Amino acid sequence: MKTWAVVGLGNNPERAAYGVAKLLQDKGHRIIPVYPRAETVHGEIGYKTLAEIPGPVDVVDCFVNSTLVGKVVDEAIAIGAKAVWLQLDVIDHEAITRAQSAGLITVMDRCPAIEYRKKN
């Protein structure tokens, strides 16, 4: 899965999303920042919402509070994403169930950067 929309990715290098997105990009994935200010990050144009992204998205990676992630998951379903990835400490069992019912691959409370490091 090559195209990752990273929800919560802005230009703050102190935030986990910034480093994880860079690692994904370095591993050959296309990253798409999704952030209220729609910033360009790591050379990629940002969008305010998932619905604004032109073209298909494989994975929606969620760097948002658990109380907000249900809406993001519903947007991921609506745009036809193949998977949703809820980062460490982002927990919403109901949202994951909705995603699974819609046929999406789901990951919750894990970090792709950590998973990459485990493989290598």
Where does each model-flagged region fall?
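Extreme N-terminal starter segment of soluble prokaryotic enzymes
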Residues: 1-3
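Conserved beta-strand elements of the Class I
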Residues: 5-7
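Helix-adjacent hinge/juxtasegments
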Residues: 30-35, 44-45, 49-58
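Short, charged, surface-exposed secondary-structure boundary motifs
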Residues: 41-44, 58, 94-97, 115-120
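Mid-chain, well-packed structural core segment of small domains
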Residues: 50, 54-93
